[in-house]
Amino acid sequence: MPVVFVAASKLPTPFATFTMHGFLDEATGREHVVLSLGDIADGQPVLGRLHSECLTGDALFSQRCDCGSQLEAALQAIAREGRGVLLYLRQEGRGIGLLNKIRAYELQDGGADTVEANERLGFAADQRDYAMCLPMLEHLGVKSLRLMTNNPRKVKALTDMNIVVAERVPLHTGHNPHNRYYLATKAGKLGHMLGNEHQGEAPQA
């Protein structure tokens, strides 16, 4: 899958001034972004996150998920460390796209959980693919990550690509009454490591 570097620029944020790197996946036409801070090509494990696009959570302040809070917390953590990388991947709705995510939300409004809704629409519970991360990390010279995630699939995906995950850093944030059952489903059916707070609240896979 050819993923090519396009351009880089400075991106000032409330947390730090990052370098924004743009990449194009020529096979899909998707445009991905990496935000980096500090020297990330020194061979030492880099604090990082793979963050899949979530328009509703990242930009529209939705409380149906924890995505926006995780994005902000990850950027804040990288800023505190003075060094890190965030890969912003254009995989809206766990890979099903924005309009299908809205369709899934409609089913959830009727009582389905996040996994059941995807499956009723004919999709897998999680359709994301992380293969594009390898050429992006290689371009940046990153060989080892301290990965901010609760998702064991991300750890496995990177490990399978021979990217060392030196440490998994939990990212527990953004919990609220509107997403409690959603998080319980992610813990119970998708294996997300959310501690004891949501374990046992949703049916197991």
Swiss-Prot record:
Pathway field: Cofactor biosynthesis; riboflavin biosynthesis; 5-amino-6-(D-ribitylamino)uracil from GTP: step 1/4
GO biological process entries: riboflavin biosynthetic process
Protein name, UniProt field: GTP cyclohydrolase-2
Catalytic site: D126 (proton acceptor), R128 (nucleophile)
EC number, UniProt record: 3.5.4.25
Cellular compartments per GO CC: cytosol
Entry keyword Hydrolase: yes
